Amino acid sequence: MLLRRTVGLIVTSGLAAALLAPTTPAVAAVTSGAVFNNPTVASQQYAIVEHVQRLIQGAASGSTIRVAMYHFTLTRVSNDLSAAYDRGVHVRVVVDSQSRSYPAVTGLIAKLGTNRAAASWVTVCTTDRACIGNLNTPIMHNKFFLFSDTLGSTNVLVQSSANLTNDNAERYWNNAVTIVGNTAVYNSYVTYHGDLAAQVKNNDYYRTTSSGTAKSYFFPRAGTTQDTDTIYNMLNENVTCEGNTSTGTETGRTIIRIGMWHFSRNPIATKLRELADQKCWVEVVYTETDTDVRNILSGHDRIKLYQITGDYIVHSKYMLIEGTYDGQKDTKWAVTGSHNYSNAALRENDEALLRIQSATIHDQYRSNFWALRDAAVPVS
């Protein structure tokens, strides 16, 4: 009887202890999807930065974080990378030469060193050049993050339009898309990151990798004509305007939406107007464009232009296609990255672009586009 009573007390007290002990909150899994900041709402300004910080903080010991960043001034992020290094994460960072003297970068260099034979390092691109591009005065304009293992997920890719600066959070509209578990596309970014770090100059670096619902594109791309303009080709070879039944306009016409920092490539504008002539619907929200592009796009019933200027500007670089693409009707696509629709982004700079077929991700971007449009002024 005494033994039975003692066992009962042990079981009861153990259960009570288990019930009273603090529980560890479940770690939210990393999922594919888009994140956007809103510079006009204080609580939403750093949404992209906080997303990246969470992934850095969740990186497993022995895993690898890779970063490629044009402007990097946020010490809150460099501090997280340093802390990750301290707990055994391999941290490899490539930055443009314009970031060389920023405290966030000099602090990382002091912590990680610059020896690429080591497991962790920082590499700064050639002064007044990109890491790969060497035509005219190119820049390493990338903004992406790779996590081999974070928060229980492997092969996590984050492609952003945002630099790691306060202005990119507090003044600029930006986006970031996360793709989880697409090994082929993830590895294409790993290879590109390694090539950026190696700094072998190549003005015709252009490479693509397609797997599942995603495709990566890396620049610079040599050429002088529109048939080597990647965005022009996407529109010219893949977009048709009619025959949709559940997407696009009420009459089944394909809709093309563009949110763009800088738009100056005439062939893209000309193709958009041709598609509008074929009864596609086109909307563009931009910060900067040139006279030729604006004139090409103006004065068409199915093209709507909007500009964001002043204290808050659009820094995103994305295109959304809702309708028929690549012969597939009623599909939804997002094309995003660091790539402005400028000649430098195509021919000179180190840039990355990611095309995704996903109704969920497209609709996330579409909601953001509507927010941009609401914040903009109609041009035509």
Residue spans for each PLM region:
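Secretory targeting and sorting signals
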Residues: M1-A28
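HKD-type phospholipase D/PLD-like phosphodiesterase module
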Residues: A29-S63, H71-G252, C280-W281, V285-K332, ...
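Short, glycine-rich nucleotide/cofactor-binding loops
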Residues: M69-T73, I258-S264
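Active-site-proximal helices and loops of the catalytic beta/alpha 8
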Residues: P267
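Amphipathic alpha-helical interface segments
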Residues: T360-S380
